[in-house]
Amino acid sequence: MTNDIHLAFAHPVERAAASSDLPYDRISLRDYTVEVEIGAFQQERGTLQRVRFNVVVEVLPLTGPIDDDVDRILSYDRVTEAIGVELQAERINLLETLAARVAERILLEPQAERVFVRIEKLDRGPFSLGVEIVRARDGQTPAAQEHVEVPHPRVVYLSNAAVS
């Protein structure tokens, strides 16, 4: 159990190394920080905040020689481009949405088999807040939860004069 807890909060590279029996190679992007307007709360609207990305992409090993040819591998710039494209597409409220979209875009790359995406907000307090997801090419997510419709209440403020 202690090892499970350690891995749950370990860096994605360490977790990826311990979580698969398949002979994957891993490409990692660590501590990629950008400023972006993101957040569901009113105080986050119109304000840039720093967001840090850590991404690990598992790829099947090449069957032939690499020949020092960038076109034979999944290049790091494809990972940063996936992040950039999703950040520029539209304003997003939730880190969960952004992480899922980045993962989906990375999995469009033919070499990518599985991707770990961790995103953290760095400016919401003296700590970091974040989300971490795992997605695989086959569409399977570990312990995927089935979609449950949840209520979305609307809150309306009415002054005393309005209700009298």
Where in the sequence are the language-model features?
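N-terminal, polar/charged subdomain of small-to-medium soluble alpha/beta proteins
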Residues: 1-164
